């Protein structure tokens, strides 16, 4: 039966990876005005003899990369990330996967505009920003950031870094250094991405100087992304030790990768020096509208698990350490780390340096921060060909405006029960935060009610508001009527006394008593216009106006009252005063 450990291992093999996000799934799959399109290209600097059976584009030098990507740049794409499939490290046996790289290009589309006005043209530039004898020096990162910032002040947009180590010993795979001129004589099939799924075109490169950006196109048979119909893009330096969008700044790791690949192909450099490492940086240079950018490093602790000298795991609380920077408008660009400081114990911590682009003043007016997705992807390879990776996920999220910012390779490599190799890669994506109204709408369970039910609920709320308003108005009207009736009742008592003194008939007394304290009516209490008019004149003027204006009833009692002499009227006045 077994203890079940093998079952757990098989489940891990099949699992594509963990996904973390600052949003829930319905919000992740909410479309915005912006969408993206990706192109992928895999390449290597290893020769066909050193890496047989690989469909990756073969480059003689890292300096060939701008020329290789020139056509995609002309179509509006620009380099977004560059990384090796496996992070090189000196603590385990090297693998050819350390020397296969992927370059990822991105193109932005604005749905609200018919033309791609936001796709400003770029030119890919490479620069050697540092040459160090001791790359593990603590001054490495500050100097590295300083060089990046100097270039950014000139309008360049930082993409990634490639450390390249030079050894005095030539690579075992090639007997002598390969110059750029000789490297172009190698048979290489080029595949230039076209159409929706970057198809490749076979071309024979010329023998021009590949050190210049627009020079030669180095090519290879078919993309490893054949099953997906897309051209994977990856990056690698002139020596296999190069690191891409995420890399380990380790001299031992870099030197280790030199065993087997071609030696330094850069014709402009002198004989390689022992222990020397050059750090190449990649920049996108805008053709127009250059703006100054600001970059800053963030140190994040990485938890490294080791099985002897082999790295078996690399984890971190990604969002816990990064969410605050995302909310403030920071855009992750690149990540580097060094495993040399890890203790020999089974578990240890090492610092990863993550480089963010600070939000500019003009963008801060429109961008209120970013949401993020972090994917711990297990990429499966059969030999040197990719079987499962993050490409389908990127393409599906591109429709919702998610932008790839960084891919961090790791030295974690496992062999599956089927003989395939899986390696862990950390993929970072960002998107501007959704408007608060959209977030609030998503947070309510409005999907439980149909449109008709929602309409009925709204109508009931409206009726409730109207009923309350009508009730309040009715209460106010009733109160006003009671006040008026009480005043009329007082006047009715007065008139009744006058009528009794003047010998008014019993018929007049009935209506007076019945209408006392009630609303005034034309046929009730106030029927004797003459008598009541004269009598009320001795009281308040307001009573006089009210009674005279409303009394339009029977006239006979009034005429009887007027038949009395003047003395009776005076007596009535005296009685009323009393």
From Swiss-Prot:
A GO molecular-function annotation: double-stranded RNA binding
Region (Disordered): 169-271, 449-525, 551-578
Gene Ontology biological-process entries: B cell receptor signaling pathway; dsRNA transport; membrane raft assembly; positive regulation of growth rate; positive regulation of interleukin-17 production; protein localization to membrane raft; protein transport into membrane raft; response to exogenous dsRNA
Biased composition (Basic and acidic residues): 185-206, 467-485, 506-518, 557-578
Subcellular location: Cell membrane; Cytoplasm; Membrane raft; Endosome
GO cellular component: cytoplasm; early endosome; endosome; extracellular exosome; membrane raft; plasma membrane; protein-containing complex
Sequence similarity: Belongs to the raftlin family.
Protein's recorded name: Raftlin
Gene: RFTN1
């Amino acid at each position: 039966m077994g203890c079940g450990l093998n079952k757990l291992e098989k489940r891990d093999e099949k699992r594509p990876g963990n996904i973390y996000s600052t949003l829930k799934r319905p919000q992740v799959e909410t479309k915005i005005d912006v969408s993206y399109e990706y192109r992928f290209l895999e390449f290597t600097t290893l020769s066909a003899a050193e890496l047989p059976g690989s469909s990756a584009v073969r480059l003689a030098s890292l300096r060939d990369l701008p020329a290789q990507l020139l056509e995609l740049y002309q179509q509006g794409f620009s380099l977004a990330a560059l990384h090796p499939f496996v992070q090189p490290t000196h603590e385990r046996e090297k693998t050819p996967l350390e020397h296969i790289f992927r370059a990822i290009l991105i193109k932005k589309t604005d749905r609200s505009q018919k033309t791609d006005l936001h796709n400003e043209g770029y030119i890919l530039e490479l620069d050697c920003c540092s040459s160090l004898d001791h790359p593990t020096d603590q001054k490495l990162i500050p100097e590295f950031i300083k060089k990046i910032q100097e270039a950014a002040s000139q309008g360049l947009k930082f993409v990634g870094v490639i450390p390249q180590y030079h050894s005095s010993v030539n690579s075992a795979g090639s007997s002598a250094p390969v110059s750029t001129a000789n490297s172009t004589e190698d048979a290489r099939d080029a595949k230039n991405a076209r159409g929706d799924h970057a198809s490749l075109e076979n071309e024979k490169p010329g023998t021009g100087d590949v050190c210049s950006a627009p020079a030669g196109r180095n090519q290879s048979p078919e993309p490893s992304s054949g099953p997906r119909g897309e051209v994977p893009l990856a990056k690698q330096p002139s020596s296999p030790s190069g690191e891409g969008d995420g890399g380990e700044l380790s001299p031992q790791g870099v030197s280790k990768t030199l065993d087997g690949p071609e030696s330094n192909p850069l014709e402009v450099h002198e004989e390689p020096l022992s222990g020397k490492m050059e750090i190449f940086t990649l920049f996108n240079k805008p053709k127009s509208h250059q703006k100054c950018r600001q970059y800053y490093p963030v140190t994040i602790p990485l938890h490294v698990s080791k099985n002897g000298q082999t790295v078996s795991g690399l984890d971190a609380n990604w969002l816990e350490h990064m969410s605050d920077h995302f909310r403030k408008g920071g855009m992750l660009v690149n990540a580097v780390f060094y495993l040399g400081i890890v203790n020999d114990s089974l578990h240890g911590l090492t610092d990863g340096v993550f480089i963010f682009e600070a939000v500019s003043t003009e963008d801060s007016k429109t961008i209120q921060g970013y949401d993020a997705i972090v994917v711990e992807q297990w990429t499966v390879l059969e030999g040197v060909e990719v079987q499962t990776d993050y490409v389908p996920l990127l393409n599906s999220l591109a429709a919702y405006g998610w932008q790839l910012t960084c891919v961090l390779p790791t030295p974690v490599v496992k062999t599956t029960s089927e003989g395939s190799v899986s390696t862990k890669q950390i993929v970072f994506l960002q998107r501007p935060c959704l408007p608060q109204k959209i977030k609030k709408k998503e947070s309510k369970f409005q999907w439980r009610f149909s449109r008709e039910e929602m309409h009925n609920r709204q109508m009931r709320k409206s009726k409730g508001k109207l009923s309350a308003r009508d009730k309040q108005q009715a209460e106010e009207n009733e109160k006003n009527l009671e006040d008026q009736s009480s005043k009329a009742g007082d006047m009715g008592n007065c008139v009744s006394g006058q009528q009794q003194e003047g010998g008014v008939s019993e018929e007049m007394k009935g209506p007076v008593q019945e209408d006392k304290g009630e609303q005034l009516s034309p046929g009730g209490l106030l029927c004797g216009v003459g008598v009541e008019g004269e009598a009320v004149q001795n009281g308040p003027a307001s009573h006089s106006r009210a009674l005279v204006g409303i009394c339009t009833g029977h006239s006979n009692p009034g005429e009887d009252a007027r038949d009395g002499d003047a003395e009776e009227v005076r007596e009535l006045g005296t009685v009323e005063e009393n």
